[in-house]
């Protein structure tokens, strides 16, 4: 028999949320109504300007045997039962709620049982394809190292997860991989590249601003998700149309007519002008064709130009992504933030 069983989902207030009743029946426990929790739920709904529906009463039911697991994010509490040698835990299916409860209650419970967990290190990389990355670090991974290595690609890059029972072995291998990949690794542990870029800027006392076209404000959004970003990020302009590129950023009409909105020349002017407009130390710009329409033979869908200006200098990087609009926006924002990060490292 397993030591631990965890289920997720079905603890909501709707008719198809039947997990609570099924679990009560399976365990053979009675239940009662938690009046205090019901009052708490009503207060929480009232704070947001709503009257609580009667259907939510089911979320105030608690077993006469077993434990209730608190939920600091939502209204559905979890449940925990002991069935002979097996612990049964059921959690909400909403990812944000489930993750929060795992971190706040379940993982501490598991650790308290004396369960040993392997040592782990996460190396986050960007700007290097998975196959190229694996080939590049082969001199380190081909040797006997007694570690488990996992590769997790995303639109932002590739995460390398290294685990080992021995901390010294883990440290040695991760150090070798870090030496090989250098600045392709932007973070150790699960940190967003925006947080890294903001941290570098704050440490160096630098400020930056962004001029966005094809990303539609995504870069600014990612930056402002970082607490304290106002110490480095001055602001931005979403210049989606040519008219706004001219009036809002001062891109020359002759540049747009001769080279087009998606061009190195336009990206260059956008970066220089947003730098000047906000009196920043760095000006970041992106312009491209996110897709799936709008591409031409000369400028296919997925083409992107990223500009980075610093007083007296400006450089532009051309990238080619695929045909999926949302993915292109994510990848462009990541590449732009990485360009800023590298510039700050080498300042």
Q: What are the roles of these predicted feature ranges?
A:
Residues 3-4, 282:
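Short, Asp-centered acidic motifs that coordinate Mg2+ and/or phosphate
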Residues 168-347:
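Short alpha-helical segments enriched in small residues
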Residues 7-15, 92, 164-165, 286-289:
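Glycine-rich beta-strand-to-loop/alpha-helix junction loops that act as flexible
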Residues 80-81, 151, 305-310:
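Short beta-strand elements
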Residues 7-33, 177, 181-190:
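Flexible gly/pro-rich beta->alpha loop and the following alpha-helix that scaffold active-site loops
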Residues 82-156, 163-170:
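Accessory alpha-helical/coil subdomains and C-terminal extensions
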Residues 17-113:
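Proline/glycine-rich low-complexity loops and linkers
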Residues 16, 39-44, 48, 58, ...:
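Conserved N-terminal alpha-helical segment that immediately precedes and caps sugar-phosphate-binding
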